[in-house]
Amino acid sequence: MAHVFVATPMYGGMCSGIYVQSLLNLITNLSSAGHKVACSFMFNESLIPRGRNNLTHQFLKGDADYLFWIDADIKFRPQDVLRMIEADKDIIGGIYPKKEINWAQVKQAVNDGKENLANHTGSFVVNLINNQGNVVVRRDEPCEVAALGTGFMLVKRSVFEKMKEYTPIYKNDMTAYKPGEEIYAFFETPIDPESGRLLSEDYHFCHQWRKHGGTVYAAPWCELGHMGSYIFEGTLVPTTDPVTTGGGNGPAVA
């Protein structure tokens, strides 16, 4: 049985209700399956890489088998997590939508007559291995990827132990933690020397692991939600021409 350390950064100490509901269901299901679970939250840390490094530092002080990153705005199903543990991969994560609407994809979905538009509105946090053509992905099998987000990522302890060999160390100067402690900078935001892109801390983490022979997998079976805000805009009369409201031909009014 596995010992899972759930880590969630919470800027401002805030989280969404769907996250709390999902987390409580996860704890119940992991415990029922014989797994141990512990949770750690990082409040009011505005520097994301430092927050993730500090949570990883806490994880490494204990004896848990897995560090499970879950962002505070993610909705998830406990059965998907159990399958991730059973997959027995060094790094495996779920692919979740970005907080944006892909309008070009929505337009294409409407033109194609898609019935379930909600599944065609998002862009996803993932970099595929082969992004030049079509990639065949089975829903029931892990799929190797170049990088994915730490919003929903399960990492084995052995990954961090191996990465220590080539990861820089900095001394903690935050008064909220023990000053002077040496912390591994697993999560950084460097410029990729090959592409010139500024990498996010999670993509950098994946790139470093793969650069030294590791593999990263996505769990296509995960059904995730990403809580966000949206400004609903519009006007009853969008042009200078008169319009007819109601009746199915014009804007609906209540």
Predicted feature residues:
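Cationic, hydrophobic amphipathic alpha-helical membrane-interacting segments
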Residues: 12, 33, 100, 239-242
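Active-site nucleotide-sugar/metal-binding loop of Leloir-type enzymes
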Residues: 53-66
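C-terminal catalytic/acceptor-binding lobe
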Residues: 1-5, 165-254
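Conserved catalytic core of nucleotide-sugar-dependent glycosyltransferases
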Residues: 56, 77-189
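Anion (oxyanion) recognition and catalysis
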Residues: 31, 85, 209-210
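N-proximal low-complexity "stem/linker" segments adjacent to membrane-targeting elements
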Residues: 1-50, 254
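Residue-level detector of anion-binding/catalytic polar loops
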Residues: 73, 90, 215
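Short beta-strand-to-loop acidic/aromatic patch adjacent to the donor-nucleotide binding site
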Residues: 63-75
